Amino acid sequence: MAGGVGSRFWPMSTPEKPKQFIDVLGIGKSLIQLTVERFNTVIPIENVWIVTSERYKNIVMEQLPEVPESQILLEPCMRNTAPCIEYVSRKIYAKYPEANLVFSPADHIVLDVNTFREVIKNSLEFTENRDVILTLGMMPTRPETGYGYIKACGCQQTTDNGQQLCRDVTPVASNIHKVEAFKEKPNLETAKSYLNEGGYYWNAGIFIWNAKMVVKTIANLVPDLASVFDTIAPYFYTDKEPEIINQYFPTCPNISIDYAVMEKSKEVFVYPADFGWSDLGTWGSLYTHLDQDENNNASVGQNIKLIDCKNCVVHTPSERKVVIQGLDNYIIAESDNTLLICRKEDEQQIKDWQK
């Protein structure tokens, strides 16, 4: 899923080239390239599909030439994650009704790729022959207020007292739990209570379910969305598909998959995992994933000199020389003709400043 605009990462991320297409970490690969790469031993490249805005088609083809052009699906407008998932699921289902699907954002990072691949492999085994939805829950390491949370069911593994089992124990994934509830982004005190209580996981927005289950669930829970694709589906794999998509996709409800399905379905399970995940949603989160110098400065750029600076994050990927003196706890970011200098604690205002 690669249609977002990454507005919190301005000026590095812009509507013309959002963060999923940028070498955020300064390692020579964009986030979408890293995303496709970490699936490459689990899912063959011929089974990779990209859903993005039609304005990003050329960027996707340039950065991922190995993905067949026919598997780059173009949204004529933004309609959130539920229409995105319905679009690609219905198209795959039309030709491959037994398909097992993984949905992943294109702009996240994973530090422990080997563990990630093992989790995905186990997840696909779990969902292959079950009518369930599996979501990955990240083990929380701090009381984070920037993520939604997943509450795992706390029932015991026993039926001696007539209690229904809430855990599906399998040889491949014995720690998979039924989901009790999805929680919105909490305040700090609530986030602390989640950590103290246990059984709460960060919602990574990574979902695994088979194509039949996607089609059935959305038809039951979001019939107005399903009806749009009932109209579109006969034109899949025909020359008229782009025209029909442009005509009907804008009529889809603007709704997230979390609100449309995950919070309502009774068949959602969570797989707790720990593979160094971050959604890189803010400059602050990027700072924690970059190497830091002896003064806790993190920088991405070819020619940066920091003098008497502390706790700063600097992202200036151009070749121009950058000299910064005397700043503490600042964000310095440059892109094309725009330069941002702001205090870290004020970064939530960045979305407003770019308007």
Regions found by a protein language model. Give the residues of each.
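Conserved core of the sugar-phosphate nucleotidyltransferase
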Residues: V113-Q157, S174-F249, F269, E319, ...
